[in-house]
Amino acid sequence: MTAALYRNIQASLRMYFSGKYSSGTWYIDRKNENMTEDSFIELQTSMGRAQDDRKAYQYDFTQLLVHSKSVSTLDTIIGTLTAAIEGAGAIPVMDYVGYTPPSEGEPPVAHTQVGELQISRYELSQQSTISNYAVRAITVYYEFIE
């Protein structure tokens, strides 16, 4: 897998999930250590289970770590995201890295689709507590299809 494809997968996952829950604060593969938000979501990606030289890894996963100071808000966010996963089927992977914006005066150009992430399953963790946040993780397993 190329670095560009990996970044496109990250960006596509974030665009998909943040579009399904747009009122939250999102972090990709990191979080703000000085967070003050009442709730936020970390999107963490993992690659490397069954490598193929020509394609992306099979059965990779992403983890959505949902943090909230309110358990009812946590449950609402989890419900919204799991509904988005169950209804997704496949998530399009767009070329965000290689995108060139149009010149001034030219009409906008859509991002090119380079493949899709076929969701095979997801797992929902039990609720835990970190600092003063209630936390649950959604682990989504997928395969990249060209």
Which stretches of residues belong to each language-model region?
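Short amphipathic alpha-helices in soluble, non-transmembrane regions
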Residues: L13, I77-I85
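A broad, low-specificity signal marking well-ordered, structured residues that form hydrophobic/aromatic
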Residues: F40-I41, T62, L117, I138
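Ser/Thr- (and often Asn-) enriched beta-sheet segments in non-cytosolic proteins
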Residues: T25-Y27, Q118-E123, T139
